[in-house]
């Protein structure tokens, strides 16, 4: 959650008077913050030069069995 979003909620809850704001007003502002964050996230995800996830690496070659000396360690007992 964005710090702006949390700051807005905190200001609303901590204020002795809500400055004539209603819950509907607060909800409208918070929805606007959330929409803006979604738009920014969509831009970041779709950015071709700066992808959020690295491209997948090549999967290991499973056509050949592993050498005999590379067995997995035994599972730890509880």
Curated annotation (Swiss-Prot):
<keyword id="KW-0244">Early protein</keyword>
<dbReference type="GO" id="GO:0042025">
    <property type="term" value="C:host cell nucleus"/>
</dbReference>
<keyword id="KW-1035">Host cytoplasm</keyword>
<comment type="subunit">
    <text>Interacts with host TAP1 and TAP2; these interactions inhibit the loading of peptides onto MHC class I molecules.</text>
</comment>
<dbReference type="Pfam" id="PF05363">
    <property type="entry name" value="Herpes_US12"/>
</dbReference>
<keyword id="KW-1107">Inhibition of host TAP by virus</keyword>
<dbReference type="GO" id="GO:0030430">
    <property type="term" value="C:host cell cytoplasm"/>
</dbReference>
<protein>
    <recommendedName>
        <fullName>ICP47 protein</fullName>
    </recommendedName>
</protein>
<dbReference type="InterPro" id="IPR008026">
    <property type="entry name" value="Herpes_ICP47"/>
</dbReference>
<keyword id="KW-1080">Inhibition of host adaptive immune response by virus</keyword>
<feature type="region of interest" description="Active domain">
    <location>
        <begin position="3"/>
        <end position="36"/>
    </location>
</feature>
<dbReference type="GO" id="GO:0039588">
    <property type="term" value="P:symbiont-mediated suppression of host antigen processing and presentation"/>
</dbReference>
<comment type="similarity">
    <text>Belongs to the herpesviridae US12 family.</text>
</comment>
<keyword id="KW-1048">Host nucleus</keyword>
<feature type="compositionally biased region" description="Basic and acidic residues">
    <location>
        <begin position="38"/>
        <end position="50"/>
    </location>
</feature>
<keyword id="KW-0899">Viral immunoevasion</keyword>
<comment type="function">
    <text>Plays a role in the inhibition of host immune response. Binds specifically to transporters associated with antigen processing (TAP), thereby blocking peptide-binding and translocation by TAP as well as subsequent loading of peptides onto MHC class I molecules. Empty MHC I molecules are retained in the endoplasmic reticulum and ultimately directed to proteasomal degradation. In consequence, infected cells are masked for immune recognition by cytotoxic T-lymphocytes.</text>
</comment>
<feature type="region of interest" description="Disordered">
    <location>
        <begin position="38"/>
        <end position="78"/>
    </location>
</feature>
<keyword id="KW-0945">Host-virus interaction</keyword>
């Amino acid at each position: 959650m964005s710090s702006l979003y949390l700051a807005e909620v905190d200001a609303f809850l901590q204020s002795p008077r809500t400055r004539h704001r209603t819950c509907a007003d607060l909800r409208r502002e918070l929805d606007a913050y959330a929409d803006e964050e979604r738009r920014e996230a969509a831009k970041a995800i779709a950015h071709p030069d700066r992808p959020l996830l690295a491209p997948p690496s090549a999967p290991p070659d499973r056509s050949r069995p592993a050498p005999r000396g590379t067995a997995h360690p035994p599972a730890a007992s509880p």
